[in-house]
Amino acid sequence: GCITTKELGTVMRSLGQNPTEAELQDMINEVDADGNGTIDFPEFLNLMARKMKDTDSEEELKEAFRVFDKDQNGFISAAELRHVMTNLGEKLTDEEVDEMIREADVDGDGQINYDEFVKVMMAK
C-alpha cells in the first residue's frame, strides 16, 4: 500500500500537474515520515492536503471546474459529469452519476455549482 515517485507522477499528471522527477522526489521526502523512500496512504493524504493549500490551488480548481462545465454556464450537470468521467475511463451507470451529483449538490438543484465543487475537492 505504498506510493512510489512513478505512481505519484501518474497521479499528479492526471490532475493536470507536470512535476519533474526531482520535484516528485522532494514531495515524497517532504512527507515520508518513516524515511523508506515511498509514501503510505496517510503520508499521501498529508501531501495532497499541503498541495491543495498552496496559493495556486484556487486557479487549479477553477481550471478543473471549467473542464467539467462544458457549456460554461457555471454548473456541472449530470451529463457533463458523465462525459468527463467517461473520458477518464470510468464507465458509470446513470445511478452512479446521479449519486455523485447528490453527494456534492448542497442546494439540491440537481447540478453542482463552483462552491459545491470546491467543497468536494477540498474535502478529499
Swiss-Prot record:
Q: Which residues bind Ca(2+) 2?
A: 32, 34, 36, 38, 43
A GO molecular-function descriptor: calcium ion binding
Please list the tissues where expression of this protein has been recorded.
Expression of PCM4 very low in stolon tips, stems, roots, leaves and tubers. PCM2 not detected in the organs tested.
Q: Which InterPro entries does the record associate with it?
A: CALM/Myosin/TropC-like (IPR050230), EF-hand-dom_pair (IPR011992), EF_Hand_1_Ca_BS (IPR018247), EF_hand_dom (IPR002048)
Question: Which controlled-vocabulary keywords does the entry list?
Answer: Calcium, Metal-binding, Methylation, Repeat
The record ties this protein, via PROSITE patterns, to: EF_HAND_1, EF_HAND_2
Q: What else is known?
A: This protein may have four calcium-binding sites.
Q: What is this protein called?
A: Calmodulin-2/4
What is the gene called? PCM2
